[in-house]
Amino acid sequence: MECVEAFLGDFSVDDLLDLSNADTSLESSSSQRKEDEQEREKFKSFSDQSTRLSPPEDLLSFPGDAPVGDLEDLEWLSNFVEDSFSESYISSDFPVNPVASVEVRRQCVPVKPRSKRRRTNGRIWSMESPSPLLSTAVARRKKRGRQKVDASYGGVVQQQQLRRCCSHCGVQKTPQWRMGPLGAKTLCNACGVRFKSGRLLPEYRPACSPTFTNEIHSNSHRKVLELRLMKVADPARV
């Protein structure tokens, strides 16, 4: 009984009739509901704008602060819109290369087929290598031709050597034929050397000459000059 009396003493009727705390709780709950409704309306308007494929800047430009969950949804929607724009840009038609189109047109131009003409006068050359028998026969013919040419040339040279003699002294054998007053290879080696130096005189004869005479010829230039002086002094001696 003492406890009940103490509780009743602490509890008053004014406190029971005081509804100020209830009013504040009701006001807070109603304000929370209003905020939730406003957020829902904002999200609904945002979803309507996203269905119209508005740019990402318009989607993110809305007044007021949004909670973390709504921001994640907005980021997902912005990524989706960017991907859709990039796909539409990639799938757009690119300009056609004019050079490629011209090449395709050239390839598509019809061409008349060439008429096949028969060649009657043309020779047919075989691409095969010649037979060994044919090659040996050709080689033998070439060798025979060379031998004939060499033999004929050698005979001519021998005849020329037999007939050739020095036009000054009459020598037929000499190590080298030289230029003379009658042309090339008309003098023997000794007479040709003296003719080149300007000392070929009628009194000069080499010792091997068949026309050599001791009284009127000599192979020494000094002796030749003496003989000439003697002819001038005594013309009857000649």
From Swiss-Prot:
Could you tell me the keywords of this UniProt record?
Activator, DNA-binding, Metal-binding, Nucleus, Transcription, Transcription regulation, Zinc, Zinc-finger
Top-level taxonomic group: Eukaryota
Segments of skewed composition (Basic and acidic residues): 32-45
Query: Where does the motif Nuclear localization signal lie?
Result: 112-119
Q: Where in the cell is it found?
A: Nucleus
Under Gene Ontology molecular function, one entry of this record is:
zinc ion binding
Q: Can you name this protein?
A: GATA transcription factor 7
Q: Upper lineage ranks?
A: Eukaryota, Viridiplantae, Streptophyta, Embryophyta, Tracheophyta
